[in-house]
């Protein structure tokens, strides 16, 4: 996936990891200036071999581009996140084909972090309560992680839990982090967690933040 060029998203697809084909003709037309933020590298999320979502910004509306057939067809859906040439949806994650969360903000503002959830595969989005972080949400991750089918019984307490990390302008070398047990209805700060650009989980007991200067921080629930 790439920023739009002349109104077209120059996206490519692989089914074997070796060969690639353009699916640009399958993508929705881009809005003027529409792009995806590099930030944490989580502007694209997948579920299985057929479902994928792309978070965008940089234009008048922050959108989610979604496919349910492996990229043969795509639809664009509006989100309520702030959007402008320096703002939009930055990170997206889904815990199953229907339930997901997207986060972002304005890279030029330190009071713009926002997030929204979907329960219909990305078609409609509802703002969460305000996340208690400064800057823009660079990354978010479900705590259930990539191994959620093999979780221990107690780990399912975290099926709806999400961790976010945010960075502040202008240098994006400091910031804050928080987590929610219920997809944004309630939030809790993670004191002392600052300067991390991305977070991901294998299981609730094994998650990692990565950030400036080669920082790595393990987080466990």
Where are these regions (language model features)?
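Residue-level hotspots at or immediately adjacent to binding/recognition sites across diverse folds
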Residues: 1-221
